[in-house]
Amino acid sequence: QYFPIKTGFMKTTPLKAVDGVSFSIKPGETTTVDLVMRESKDDIQVIGNFNSESTYKPMDSDELKSILATTGRGYYIVAVLGAGQEPTNHALRDIAALGKDFDEWGRGIVLLFPNEEQYKKFRPQEFPGLPATITYGIDVDGSIQKQIAEGMKLSNKTILPMFIIGDTFNRVVFVSQGYTIGLGEQLMKVIHKL
């Protein structure tokens, strides 16, 4: 009797990258089979999930609003920032440097702060060129930060900033946490493959 093993990963397209092998097991013996996981260097891969119905408090409203209601259907960027912290400042400078590219992409970017005090420390004028598609808000109870950390299996749940590119099918195709060199370029590289 033969047994199949199938391995692979889900892509953002209907195609899936799958490998398979069949093997047999003889009574009283141990059978060792190599487990081969395909990896694509070029394709965008689904690396986790994030609920696009998650809510936050927009800075221009007292009502909670979902990421989906803010960005519409399709891909979006969500980040939880630490205002005045160098890793966040560096990330925002990287994004501002490519602000026109993000504006051309035209998708929503939701930048969240852990609380009102953090938002009050934020000085957008220090980052000229930030995309016009940004919506600022508060991660009211820390649920979005927690969801990103858990959904992406981040080893440290408190290091900011946290960035994801996700879609409204709740798939995540990019994650970054903490100090990252060239974050704007990394985001655009993924965006161009979507």
Task: Label every PLM stretch briefly.
Residues 131-135, 150-164:
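Structural micro-motif
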Residues 58-60, 133-143:
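Short acidic-hydrophobic, aromatic-tinged amphipathic segments that line or gate anion-handling sites
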Residues 3-34:
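Structured interaction patches on ligand/partner-binding surfaces of diverse proteins
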Residues 24-64, 186-192:
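Pro/Ala/Gly-rich low-complexity, hydrophilic intrinsically disordered segments
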Residues 37-45, 159-194:
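Thiol-/selenol-based redox modules, centered on thioredoxin-like
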Residues 74-76, 83-130, 142-147:
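Structural microenvironment flanking redox-active thiols in thiol-disulfide oxidoreductases
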Residues 50-76, 93-97:
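A short beta-strand-turn-helix
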Residues 1-4, 170:
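A short tyrosine-centered beta-strand micro-motif
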